[in-house]
């Protein structure tokens, strides 16, 4: 049973996947999207769901530091509804506050990756953090 983790932005969706036991998360790829033109990368996401035999999807929920939700949180909730409707998979959310900051810090301090290269992988690593935090706190996602 594998779970996908998503970091949904307005231009990209970072994708990660759990191992079959649901213990660890690893980055998969970054899907290009365009919210303005209603292009949400659903075809590619469907391919990944099939390739990885995913049984559920966890999306990062970008909350403000005061725990309120803004427009990006609403966009994540809408993306989850689209996934449920299109693929019939259960979805859940994981607070993603500071995951991108944490991913950026790791890439700078531990991997010494240049800014240009960081931009190419940051969303995938943020998706990894989102999914790993979910697995550590909640475990398996089922219908």
From Swiss-Prot:
The keyword Isomerase does not apply. Its EC number is 3.1.-.-. It is an enzyme of class 3 (hydrolase). This is Putative pre-16S rRNA nuclease. InterPro entries: RNaseH-like_sf, YqgF, YqgF/RNaseH-like_dom, YqgF/RNaseH-like_dom_sf. Signal peptide: none annotated. Belongs to the YqgF nuclease family. It comes from the Bacteria. SMART domains: YqgFc. One of its GO terms (biological process) is rRNA 5'-end processing. GO terms for cellular component: cytosol. GO terms for molecular function: nuclease activity. It is found in: Cytoplasm. Could be a nuclease involved in processing of the 5'-end of pre-16S rRNA. It comes from Leuconostoc mesenteroides subsp. mesenteroides (strain ATCC 8293 / DSM 20343 / BCRC 11652 / CCM 1803 / JCM 6124 / NCDO 523 / NBRC 100496 / NCIMB 8023 / NCTC 12954 / NRRL B-1118 / 37Y). Keywords: Cytoplasm, Hydrolase, Nuclease, Ribosome biogenesis.
């Amino acid at each position: 049973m594998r779970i996908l983790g998503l970091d949904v932005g307005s231009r990209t969706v970072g994708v990660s996947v759990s191992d079959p036991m649901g213990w660890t998360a690893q980055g998969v790829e970054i899907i290009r999207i365009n919210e303005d033109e209603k292009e949400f990368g659903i075809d590619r996401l469907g391919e990944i769901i099939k390739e990885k035999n995913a049984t559920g999807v966890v999306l990062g929920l970008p909350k403000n530091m005061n725990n309120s939700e803004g427009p990006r949180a609403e966009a994540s909730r809408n993306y989850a509804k689209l996934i449920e409707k299109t693929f019939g998979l259960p979805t859940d959310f994981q607070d993603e506050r500071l995951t991108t900051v944490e991913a950026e810090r790791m890439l700078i301090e531990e991997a010494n990756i240049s800014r240009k290269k960081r931009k190419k992988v940051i969303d995938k690593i943020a998706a990894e953090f989102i999914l790993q935090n979910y697995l550590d706190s909640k475990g398996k996602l089922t219908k």
